[in-house]
A protein has these predicted regions:
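A structural signal for small-residue-enriched, beta-sheet-centric alpha/beta enzyme cores
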Residues: 2-12, 46, 56-62, 67-128, ...
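N-terminal, positively charged regions that mediate nucleic acid binding
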Residues: 1-65
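Phosphate-interacting basic helix/loop segments used at nucleotide- and nucleic-acid interfaces
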Residues: 19-34, 131-151
Length: 250
């Protein structure tokens, strides 16, 4: 088994709408002495993808609904931000105190529909999740492949966990690789057949990448080298989102 390396790509400028992320990442990696190579997995923070795609809103332009105003007044929240959270949601899964757990239009269940104000680039601005993170990942991967680098791409975002404290990064978009590694049908060294074991390697890689990234360190991209990923150009992140009919808790 080859050793696994994880390193961050720094030196990226503030991302503006229309930015060509693949080109910028390739240049920053080369400038930092760590050029991308075939077989790499490139994990890109969703926030810079959203900025490049113009997925930001100015809260001053938002007219909150009566519910957003009432709920925000009760819990000391910004009604414009609450309205954005509601607009980005398919439904509210849990509303407990000042916390809104929502299901996004992508099918993700997370706090505040993934809407975030940190590192937004300006006061009073909020960053939304990409409209189609798989399409975003495919576009970045296509840019890498055009430059001669066959690398897989994961778009990551930070999610909380229902049963544990602390947050971790998970994959919300993928291109070029299978997101799940199945052991079903295989046999362990003692002869026991695996019946249900499936590893979400996309989430594991996203979480590992966060160890060298972070909101305050200005390292929005990480490269994982040495992971033997399974090629799949038709893969989508929807395959890791559990269908509601099989969800025991929603």
């Amino acid at each position: 088994m080859s050793p696994l390396q994880i390193f961050g790509i720094s030196g990226l400028p503030e991302i503006e709408p229309g930015a060509e992320l693949a080109t910028m990442i390739l240049r920053a990696a080369t400038a930092g002495g760590q050029s991308l190579a075939g077989g790499d997995v490139v994990v890109v923070t969703s926030k810079i993808v959203s900025k490049a795609e113009g997925r930001t809103v100015e809260l001053a332009d938002i007219d909150p609904s009566p519910f957003a105003r009432e709920w925000s007044a009760q819990w000391g929240k910004d009604p414009a931000l609450t309205e954005v959270v509601l607009r980005e949601s398919k439904r509210v899964v849990r509303q407990i105190g000042p916390v809104l757990i929502t299901e996004t239009h992508h099918g993700f269940v997370c706090a505040n529909s993934g809407v975030d104000q940190s590192s937004s680039g300006a006061q009073g601005r909020a960053v939304l999740l990409p409209l189609d993170s798989d399409a975003s990942a495919r576009a970045i991967r296509a840019g890498f492949v055009a430059a001669g680098v066959n690398a897989a791409v994961i778009i990551s975002d930070t999610f909380g966990r229902a049963w544990r404290e602390g947050q971790t990064d998970v994959a919300i978009g993928i291109a070029g690789m299978q997101p799940i590694l199945s052991y079903i049908g295989q046999v362990d060294p003692h002869g026991h057949e695996f019946m249900v074991q499936e590893l979400c390697t996309a989430d594991e890689l996203a979480g590992a990448a966060e160890l060298v990234k972070g909101n305050v360190s200005r390292v929005p991209v990480a490269v994982i080298r040495g992971h033997q990923w399974q090629v799949d150009d038709s893969a989508t992140i929807s395959s890791v989102v559990r269908d509601q009919s099989r969800d025991l808790f929603r």
